[in-house]
């Protein structure tokens, strides 16, 4: 699910944080990709009649079709992908996962009913809601990646958090996922739509965390608190708190502790905090996720030549893919993985670390900006109060 409305909040308040461009702009870059999110997107790319792509034996092949051709598209454009798979979910996420499972069960029943009585749109809508990524899907995709010569690693828990670690360490240029919570895990750059099909003609969104924080006038802790208020995978949102309200609450109070205190003291009880709402635990999962250090041997990876005959055996003989297309794709992989070895010019220059004085100046400017925002809001509130207090002119 990610963070509800976060893209909208950043687009409206920190537009400089978002760049949209063509996939070829990322030539020569290494990118860590959230594998589970990608596989899910491949599985919901169903045909209009709501059916998954199937082999002759009735096995689902949508995930393999998507993984093979979308990865091929990236490599064709000079990108070197690394896939990161989810490990066990954090305990705090189990409640949300249970709710999702219940929703999928309801959707399955609704899907069956729609097939009998509903429209084509109903069938497709409920079909998408029944989709879930299984261990078998993951295992088959890992087998495919190995045969393609594309590296993958397993994260201890959340794949997005591990992608963020690799991006911060400079082992990859960016983390790629549709989940906006990748930014909460401190990924410096998030790429979205990278694994979308070419037919969708969606530009690649490149979101820079530092620019988002600057535009929002927040530090990382406040940004995480904002994301929890917006609604994340770990907690249900506070009813009636939408994106504008969430942003105002954090700007007015600074921390979730003070937001909660303000809500609980409000005599009007405009908002009601859910009975069990362990926001501090959710914050801790974003600040200190269970991840491997970027220098851990488990995080070593390299790109290798594809096993062409192995791909033919697996995709053509086992899964019923077209042999000419598979061989053609494997040949492109072999050729373009070598081309992707070429370095971008920016790779020759390492960013210079900021001095303590520069960091202090940035912090001072940030604090001044926050104070200025608070002062302006107080003045606006005072002006409104005075306007209300003025006697109305006689008609």
Swiss-Prot record:
<keyword id="KW-0539">Nucleus</keyword>
<dbReference type="InterPro" id="IPR008918">
    <property type="entry name" value="HhH2"/>
</dbReference>
<keyword id="KW-0378">Hydrolase</keyword>
<feature type="binding site">
    <location>
        <position position="158"/>
    </location>
    <ligand>
        <name>Mg(2+) 1</name>
    </ligand>
</feature>
<dbReference type="GO" id="GO:0005730">
    <property type="term" value="C:nucleolus"/>
</dbReference>
<dbReference type="Pfam" id="PF00867">
    <property type="entry name" value="XPG_I"/>
</dbReference>
<feature type="binding site">
    <location>
        <position position="86"/>
    </location>
    <ligand>
        <name>Mg(2+) 1</name>
    </ligand>
</feature>
<feature type="binding site">
    <location>
        <position position="70"/>
    </location>
    <ligand>
        <name>DNA</name>
    </ligand>
</feature>
<dbReference type="InterPro" id="IPR006086">
    <property type="entry name" value="XPG-I_dom"/>
</dbReference>
<feature type="region of interest" description="I-domain">
    <location>
        <begin position="122"/>
        <end position="253"/>
    </location>
</feature>
<keyword id="KW-0234">DNA repair</keyword>
<dbReference type="InterPro" id="IPR006085">
    <property type="entry name" value="XPG_DNA_repair_N"/>
</dbReference>
<dbReference type="GO" id="GO:0003677">
    <property type="term" value="F:DNA binding"/>
</dbReference>
<dbReference type="GO" id="GO:0017108">
    <property type="term" value="F:5'-flap endonuclease activity"/>
</dbReference>
<keyword id="KW-0227">DNA damage</keyword>
<protein>
    <recommendedName>
        <fullName>Flap endonuclease 1</fullName>
        <ecNumber>3.1.-.-</ecNumber>
    </recommendedName>
</protein>
<keyword id="KW-0460">Magnesium</keyword>
<keyword id="KW-0235">DNA replication</keyword>
<feature type="binding site">
    <location>
        <position position="231"/>
    </location>
    <ligand>
        <name>DNA</name>
    </ligand>
</feature>
<dbReference type="GO" id="GO:0005737">
    <property type="term" value="C:cytoplasm"/>
</dbReference>
<dbReference type="InterPro" id="IPR019974">
    <property type="entry name" value="XPG_CS"/>
</dbReference>
<dbReference type="GO" id="GO:0000287">
    <property type="term" value="F:magnesium ion binding"/>
</dbReference>
<feature type="compositionally biased region" description="Basic and acidic residues">
    <location>
        <begin position="357"/>
        <end position="389"/>
    </location>
</feature>
<dbReference type="GO" id="GO:0006284">
    <property type="term" value="P:base-excision repair"/>
</dbReference>
<feature type="region of interest" description="Disordered">
    <location>
        <begin position="96"/>
        <end position="122"/>
    </location>
</feature>
<comment type="subunit">
    <text>Interacts with PCNA. Three molecules of fen1 bind to one PCNA trimer with each molecule binding to one PCNA monomer. PCNA stimulates the nuclease activity without altering cleavage specificity.</text>
</comment>
<dbReference type="GO" id="GO:0008409">
    <property type="term" value="F:5'-3' exonuclease activity"/>
</dbReference>
<dbReference type="GO" id="GO:0005654">
    <property type="term" value="C:nucleoplasm"/>
</dbReference>
<feature type="region of interest" description="N-domain">
    <location>
        <begin position="1"/>
        <end position="104"/>
    </location>
</feature>
<dbReference type="GO" id="GO:0005634">
    <property type="term" value="C:nucleus"/>
</dbReference>
<dbReference type="Pfam" id="PF00752">
    <property type="entry name" value="XPG_N"/>
</dbReference>
<feature type="binding site">
    <location>
        <position position="179"/>
    </location>
    <ligand>
        <name>Mg(2+) 2</name>
    </ligand>
</feature>
<feature type="binding site">
    <location>
        <position position="47"/>
    </location>
    <ligand>
        <name>DNA</name>
    </ligand>
</feature>
<feature type="binding site">
    <location>
        <position position="158"/>
    </location>
    <ligand>
        <name>DNA</name>
    </ligand>
</feature>
<keyword id="KW-0496">Mitochondrion</keyword>
<keyword id="KW-0255">Endonuclease</keyword>
<dbReference type="InterPro" id="IPR036279">
    <property type="entry name" value="5-3_exonuclease_C_sf"/>
</dbReference>
<dbReference type="GO" id="GO:0043137">
    <property type="term" value="P:DNA replication, removal of RNA primer"/>
</dbReference>
<dbReference type="InterPro" id="IPR023426">
    <property type="entry name" value="Flap_endonuc"/>
</dbReference>
<comment type="function">
    <text>Structure-specific nuclease with 5'-flap endonuclease and 5'-3' exonuclease activities involved in DNA replication and repair. During DNA replication, cleaves the 5'-overhanging flap structure that is generated by displacement synthesis when DNA polymerase encounters the 5'-end of a downstream Okazaki fragment. It enters the flap from the 5'-end and then tracks to cleave the flap base, leaving a nick for ligation. Also involved in the long patch base excision repair (LP-BER) pathway, by cleaving within the apurinic/apyrimidinic (AP) site-terminated flap.</text>
</comment>
<feature type="binding site">
    <location>
        <position position="181"/>
    </location>
    <ligand>
        <name>Mg(2+) 2</name>
    </ligand>
</feature>
<dbReference type="GO" id="GO:0005739">
    <property type="term" value="C:mitochondrion"/>
</dbReference>
